[in-house]
Amino acid sequence: MHTPVLTDRVLELLAPALSRPGAVVVDATVGLGGHAAALLAAFPEVRVVGLDRDLDALAHSGERLRALAPERVRLVHAVYDEIGTVLAGLGSARVQGVLFDLGVSSLQLDTDARGFAYSRDAPLDMRMDATRGLTAAEVLNTYDAAALARILRDYGEERFARRIAESVVRARAVEPFTTSARLVDLVRDAIPAPARRTGGNPAKRTFQALRIEVNSELDVLARALPAAFDALAVGGRLVVLSYHSLEDRLVKRELRGYAETLVPPDMPVVPAGAEPRLRWLTRGAEPAGEVEKADNPRAASVRLRAAERTAPNPDRTQPTIGGAS
Protein backbone atom coordinates (compact mmCIF):
# COMPACT_ATOMS: atom_id res chain seq x y z
CA MET A 1 0.00 0.00 0.00
CA HIS A 2 1.33 3.43 -0.96
CA THR A 3 2.03 5.58 2.10
CA PRO A 4 1.56 9.32 1.49
CA VAL A 5 4.19 11.66 2.91
CA LEU A 6 3.64 14.00 5.89
CA THR A 7 -0.10 13.26 5.99
CA ASP A 8 -0.65 14.42 9.57
CA ARG A 9 1.15 17.70 8.95
CA VAL A 10 -0.79 18.30 5.73
CA LEU A 11 -4.10 17.77 7.55
CA GLU A 12 -3.02 20.03 10.40
CA LEU A 13 -2.10 22.87 8.06
CA LEU A 14 -5.26 22.61 5.97
CA ALA A 15 -7.66 22.08 8.88
CA PRO A 16 -8.52 25.74 9.66
CA ALA A 17 -9.62 26.27 6.05
CA LEU A 18 -11.28 22.91 5.42
CA SER A 19 -13.30 22.78 8.64
CA ARG A 20 -15.71 25.41 7.30
CA PRO A 21 -19.04 24.33 5.76
CA GLY A 22 -18.93 23.65 2.03
CA ALA A 23 -15.13 23.64 1.80
CA VAL A 24 -13.48 22.50 -1.43
CA VAL A 25 -9.87 21.31 -1.66
CA VAL A 26 -7.88 20.64 -4.82
CA ASP A 27 -5.43 17.76 -4.69
CA ALA A 28 -3.47 18.90 -7.71
CA THR A 29 -1.40 15.71 -7.89
CA VAL A 30 -3.85 13.11 -6.64
CA GLY A 31 -1.73 10.11 -7.65
CA LEU A 32 -2.87 6.98 -5.84
CA GLY A 33 -5.18 9.02 -3.63
CA GLY A 34 -3.42 8.68 -0.28
CA HIS A 35 -3.64 12.33 0.75
CA ALA A 36 -7.12 12.69 -0.77
CA ALA A 37 -8.40 9.69 1.20
CA ALA A 38 -7.03 11.21 4.40
CA LEU A 39 -8.72 14.53 3.60
CA LEU A 40 -12.07 12.85 3.00
CA ALA A 41 -11.80 10.97 6.29
CA ALA A 42 -10.63 13.95 8.36
CA PHE A 43 -13.17 16.45 7.02
CA PRO A 44 -16.58 14.78 6.58
CA GLU A 45 -18.08 17.63 4.57
CA VAL A 46 -15.14 18.60 2.38
CA ARG A 47 -15.31 18.09 -1.37
CA VAL A 48 -12.13 16.96 -3.14
CA VAL A 49 -11.21 17.85 -6.70
CA GLY A 50 -8.36 15.58 -7.75
CA LEU A 51 -6.14 16.31 -10.74
CA ASP A 52 -3.53 14.11 -12.34
CA ARG A 53 -1.94 13.91 -15.76
CA ASP A 54 -1.43 10.14 -15.32
CA LEU A 55 -4.45 8.10 -16.43
CA ASP A 56 -3.19 5.00 -14.61
CA ALA A 57 -3.01 6.97 -11.36
CA LEU A 58 -6.52 8.32 -11.88
CA ALA A 59 -7.85 4.80 -12.39
CA HIS A 60 -6.30 3.64 -9.11
CA SER A 61 -7.30 6.70 -7.08
CA GLY A 62 -10.78 6.74 -8.60
CA GLU A 63 -11.50 3.22 -7.41
CA ARG A 64 -10.15 4.01 -3.95
CA LEU A 65 -11.78 7.40 -3.39
CA ARG A 66 -15.19 6.64 -4.85
CA ALA A 67 -15.43 3.70 -2.47
CA LEU A 68 -15.00 6.17 0.40
CA ALA A 69 -17.20 9.09 -0.62
CA PRO A 70 -18.33 9.07 -4.25
CA GLU A 71 -20.53 12.14 -3.86
CA ARG A 72 -17.63 14.25 -2.55
CA VAL A 73 -14.98 13.43 -5.17
CA ARG A 74 -14.37 14.76 -8.67
CA LEU A 75 -11.34 13.47 -10.57
CA VAL A 76 -10.05 15.19 -13.69
CA HIS A 77 -7.36 14.22 -16.20
CA ALA A 78 -5.33 17.43 -16.23
CA VAL A 79 -1.91 18.89 -15.53
CA TYR A 80 -1.74 20.95 -12.36
CA ASP A 81 -1.18 24.26 -14.14
CA GLU A 82 -4.73 23.80 -15.48
CA ILE A 83 -6.31 24.34 -12.05
CA GLY A 84 -8.13 27.49 -13.13
CA THR A 85 -9.61 25.90 -16.23
CA VAL A 86 -10.68 22.78 -14.33
CA LEU A 87 -12.38 24.76 -11.56
CA ALA A 88 -14.15 26.99 -14.06
CA GLY A 89 -15.47 23.89 -15.80
CA LEU A 90 -16.77 22.56 -12.49
CA GLY A 91 -18.35 25.87 -11.54
CA SER A 92 -16.09 26.43 -8.52
CA ALA A 93 -15.05 30.07 -8.36
CA ARG A 94 -12.83 29.69 -5.30
CA VAL A 95 -11.52 26.86 -3.16
CA GLN A 96 -10.38 26.62 0.44
CA GLY A 97 -7.31 24.47 -0.03
CA VAL A 98 -4.78 23.35 -2.63
CA LEU A 99 -2.25 20.54 -2.17
CA PHE A 100 0.72 19.72 -4.39
CA ASP A 101 2.69 16.50 -3.83
CA LEU A 102 5.33 16.96 -6.50
CA GLY A 103 7.70 14.62 -8.29
CA VAL A 104 7.38 11.10 -9.57
CA SER A 105 4.79 8.84 -7.95
CA SER A 106 5.25 5.40 -6.42
CA LEU A 107 3.10 3.91 -9.18
CA GLN A 108 5.31 5.43 -11.86
CA LEU A 109 8.52 4.28 -10.17
CA ASP A 110 7.22 0.76 -9.60
CA THR A 111 5.89 0.21 -13.14
CA ASP A 112 8.84 -0.91 -15.26
CA ALA A 113 7.21 0.00 -18.57
CA ARG A 114 7.07 3.67 -17.54
CA GLY A 115 10.87 3.90 -17.52
CA PHE A 116 11.30 6.16 -14.48
CA ALA A 117 13.56 3.89 -12.42
CA TYR A 118 17.27 3.61 -13.19
CA SER A 119 17.57 0.46 -11.06
CA ARG A 120 15.77 -1.75 -13.61
CA ASP A 121 16.10 -2.07 -17.38
CA ALA A 122 12.97 -0.68 -19.03
CA PRO A 123 11.85 1.40 -22.02
CA LEU A 124 13.02 5.02 -21.79
CA ASP A 125 9.61 6.65 -21.63
CA MET A 126 9.30 8.78 -18.44
CA ARG A 127 6.10 10.55 -19.52
CA MET A 128 3.73 11.18 -16.63
CA ASP A 129 0.98 11.47 -19.23
CA ALA A 130 1.58 8.52 -21.53
CA THR A 131 -0.89 9.91 -24.08
CA ARG A 132 1.23 12.83 -25.28
CA GLY A 133 4.67 14.39 -25.51
CA LEU A 134 8.22 13.27 -26.26
CA THR A 135 9.63 10.23 -24.50
CA ALA A 136 13.01 10.24 -22.78
CA ALA A 137 14.35 8.11 -25.63
CA GLU A 138 13.26 10.73 -28.15
CA VAL A 139 14.98 13.45 -26.14
CA LEU A 140 18.21 11.44 -25.98
CA ASN A 141 18.09 10.56 -29.67
CA THR A 142 17.18 13.99 -31.09
CA TYR A 143 18.57 16.79 -28.89
CA ASP A 144 22.00 18.08 -29.83
CA ALA A 145 24.90 17.89 -27.38
CA ALA A 146 24.48 21.48 -26.19
CA ALA A 147 20.77 21.01 -25.42
CA LEU A 148 21.41 17.73 -23.62
CA ALA A 149 24.19 19.29 -21.56
CA ARG A 150 21.90 22.18 -20.63
CA ILE A 151 19.12 20.00 -19.28
CA LEU A 152 21.56 17.76 -17.42
CA ARG A 153 23.18 20.81 -15.84
CA ASP A 154 20.02 22.83 -15.15
CA TYR A 155 17.61 20.05 -14.19
CA GLY A 156 19.99 17.42 -12.81
CA GLU A 157 22.64 19.70 -11.35
CA GLU A 158 25.09 17.32 -13.00
CA ARG A 159 28.74 18.40 -12.80
CA PHE A 160 29.70 16.26 -15.77
CA ALA A 161 26.83 17.31 -18.01
CA ARG A 162 28.92 18.02 -21.09
CA ARG A 163 30.85 14.75 -20.87
CA ILE A 164 27.64 12.75 -20.55
CA ALA A 165 25.93 14.66 -23.37
CA GLU A 166 28.84 14.13 -25.75
CA SER A 167 28.92 10.43 -24.87
CA VAL A 168 25.19 10.17 -25.62
CA VAL A 169 25.62 11.77 -29.04
CA ARG A 170 28.48 9.41 -29.93
CA ALA A 171 26.61 6.34 -28.71
CA ARG A 172 23.34 7.11 -30.47
CA ALA A 173 25.17 7.45 -33.80
CA VAL A 174 25.91 3.74 -33.48
CA GLU A 175 22.50 2.74 -32.13
CA PRO A 176 19.58 4.84 -30.84
CA PHE A 177 18.73 4.64 -27.15
CA THR A 178 15.66 2.60 -26.28
CA THR A 179 16.11 1.23 -22.75
CA SER A 180 17.43 2.47 -19.43
CA ALA A 181 20.23 -0.02 -18.73
CA ARG A 182 22.31 1.22 -21.64
CA LEU A 183 21.96 4.82 -20.46
CA VAL A 184 22.92 3.87 -16.89
CA ASP A 185 26.06 2.15 -18.19
CA LEU A 186 26.94 5.12 -20.39
CA VAL A 187 26.64 7.61 -17.52
CA ARG A 188 28.78 5.44 -15.27
CA ASP A 189 31.49 5.21 -17.92
CA ALA A 190 31.32 8.92 -18.81
CA ILE A 191 32.08 10.36 -15.40
CA PRO A 192 35.43 10.14 -13.55
CA ALA A 193 35.93 7.07 -11.38
CA PRO A 194 36.08 8.98 -8.05
CA ALA A 195 32.66 10.52 -8.75
CA ARG A 196 31.13 7.08 -9.23
CA ARG A 197 31.83 6.20 -5.63
CA THR A 198 29.89 9.09 -4.06
CA GLY A 199 26.26 10.20 -3.98
CA GLY A 200 24.51 6.94 -4.87
CA ASN A 201 23.83 5.75 -8.42
CA PRO A 202 25.71 7.98 -10.91
CA ALA A 203 22.67 7.95 -13.23
CA LYS A 204 20.33 9.47 -10.64
CA ARG A 205 20.88 13.08 -11.74
CA THR A 206 20.62 12.22 -15.44
CA PHE A 207 17.30 10.44 -14.94
CA GLN A 208 15.96 13.35 -12.88
CA ALA A 209 16.96 15.81 -15.60
CA LEU A 210 15.36 13.78 -18.37
CA ARG A 211 12.15 13.33 -16.38
CA ILE A 212 11.89 17.06 -15.70
CA GLU A 213 12.50 17.86 -19.37
CA VAL A 214 10.06 15.26 -20.70
CA ASN A 215 7.27 16.49 -18.41
CA SER A 216 8.19 20.21 -18.36
CA GLU A 217 7.92 19.90 -14.59
CA LEU A 218 9.48 23.19 -13.55
CA ASP A 219 7.73 25.22 -16.25
CA VAL A 220 4.40 23.66 -15.28
CA LEU A 221 5.05 24.33 -11.58
CA ALA A 222 5.94 27.96 -12.28
CA ARG A 223 2.52 28.38 -13.92
CA ALA A 224 0.65 26.23 -11.42
CA LEU A 225 1.59 28.13 -8.26
CA PRO A 226 0.08 31.48 -9.37
CA ALA A 227 -2.95 29.59 -10.69
CA ALA A 228 -3.38 27.87 -7.33
CA PHE A 229 -3.01 31.14 -5.46
CA ASP A 230 -5.63 32.79 -7.67
CA ALA A 231 -7.99 29.88 -7.01
CA LEU A 232 -7.82 30.30 -3.23
CA ALA A 233 -10.47 32.22 -1.34
CA VAL A 234 -9.18 34.63 1.28
CA GLY A 235 -8.35 32.41 4.26
CA GLY A 236 -7.64 29.47 1.96
CA ARG A 237 -4.44 27.49 2.38
CA LEU A 238 -1.79 26.09 0.05
CA VAL A 239 0.53 23.20 0.93
CA VAL A 240 3.40 22.08 -1.32
CA LEU A 241 5.56 18.97 -0.90
CA SER A 242 8.80 19.14 -2.91
CA TYR A 243 11.44 16.46 -3.31
CA HIS A 244 14.50 18.22 -4.69
CA SER A 245 16.08 21.63 -4.36
CA LEU A 246 15.01 22.87 -7.80
CA GLU A 247 11.34 22.44 -6.91
CA ASP A 248 11.70 23.88 -3.43
CA ARG A 249 13.58 26.97 -4.60
CA LEU A 250 10.94 27.58 -7.26
CA VAL A 251 8.11 27.29 -4.72
CA LYS A 252 9.84 29.76 -2.40
CA ARG A 253 10.54 32.22 -5.21
CA GLU A 254 7.09 32.10 -6.80
CA LEU A 255 5.20 32.57 -3.53
CA ARG A 256 7.53 35.08 -1.90
CA GLY A 257 6.15 37.97 -3.94
CA TYR A 258 2.65 37.41 -2.59
CA ALA A 259 3.97 37.77 0.97
CA GLU A 260 5.36 41.24 0.30
CA THR A 261 3.58 44.58 0.23
CA LEU A 262 3.00 46.21 -3.15
CA VAL A 263 4.53 49.55 -2.07
CA PRO A 264 8.11 50.76 -1.49
CA PRO A 265 9.47 49.81 1.97
CA ASP A 266 9.93 53.47 2.99
CA MET A 267 6.23 54.35 2.68
CA PRO A 268 4.85 55.13 6.18
CA VAL A 269 1.39 53.70 5.45
CA VAL A 270 0.39 50.72 3.34
CA PRO A 271 -2.73 51.74 1.39
CA ALA A 272 -5.72 49.44 1.14
CA GLY A 273 -5.22 46.86 -1.58
CA ALA A 274 -1.41 46.95 -1.32
CA GLU A 275 -1.03 44.75 1.76
CA PRO A 276 0.58 41.29 1.52
CA ARG A 277 -1.78 38.72 0.04
CA LEU A 278 -0.15 35.71 1.67
CA ARG A 279 1.39 34.75 4.99
CA TRP A 280 3.74 31.84 5.47
CA LEU A 281 2.53 29.06 7.76
CA THR A 282 5.91 27.33 7.85
CA ARG A 283 9.30 28.67 8.87
CA GLY A 284 11.33 27.78 5.83
CA ALA A 285 10.97 24.31 4.36
CA GLU A 286 9.98 21.57 6.80
CA PRO A 287 11.49 18.06 6.48
CA ALA A 288 9.89 14.85 7.65
CA GLY A 289 10.76 13.52 11.08
CA GLU A 290 13.26 10.72 11.59
CA VAL A 291 10.57 8.16 12.41
CA GLU A 292 8.67 8.84 9.18
CA LYS A 293 11.89 8.76 7.16
CA ALA A 294 12.65 5.34 8.58
CA ASP A 295 9.14 4.05 7.87
CA ASN A 296 8.67 5.67 4.45
CA PRO A 297 11.76 6.04 2.23
CA ARG A 298 10.02 8.59 -0.02
CA ALA A 299 9.90 10.99 2.93
CA ALA A 300 13.69 11.21 3.12
CA SER A 301 13.99 14.15 0.72
CA VAL A 302 10.63 15.89 1.22
CA ARG A 303 10.44 19.62 1.95
CA LEU A 304 7.08 21.12 2.91
CA ARG A 305 6.05 24.77 2.55
CA ALA A 306 2.61 26.14 3.36
CA ALA A 307 0.90 29.52 3.18
CA GLU A 308 -2.48 31.16 3.74
CA ARG A 309 -4.15 33.68 1.48
CA THR A 310 -4.77 36.87 3.48
CA ALA A 311 -6.11 39.35 0.93
CA PRO A 312 -7.69 39.51 -2.53
CA ASN A 313 -5.85 40.70 -5.61
CA PRO A 314 -5.70 44.51 -5.92
CA ASP A 315 -8.90 46.10 -7.25
CA ARG A 316 -10.69 42.79 -7.22
CA THR A 317 -13.38 41.45 -4.96
CA GLN A 318 -13.64 37.81 -4.06
CA PRO A 319 -15.38 35.67 -1.44
CA THR A 320 -13.76 35.00 1.92
CA ILE A 321 -13.23 31.57 3.40
CA GLY A 322 -16.86 31.29 4.46
CA GLY A 323 -18.12 31.55 0.88
CA ALA A 324 -17.36 28.17 -0.61
CA SER A 325 -18.10 27.66 -4.25
From Swiss-Prot:
Any idea which UniProt keywords this protein has?
Cytoplasm, Methyltransferase, rRNA processing, S-adenosyl-L-methionine, Transferase
Residues engaged in binding S-adenosyl-L-methionine: 33-35, 52, 87, 101, 108
Q: Where is the composition biased (Polar residues)?
A: 315-325
| UniProt main location, coarse | cytoplasm
GO CC terms: cytoplasm
**Main role?**
Specifically methylates the N4 position of cytidine in position 1402 (C1402) of 16S rRNA.
User: What name goes with this protein?
Assistant: Ribosomal RNA small subunit methyltransferase H
Q: Which gene encodes it?
A: rsmH
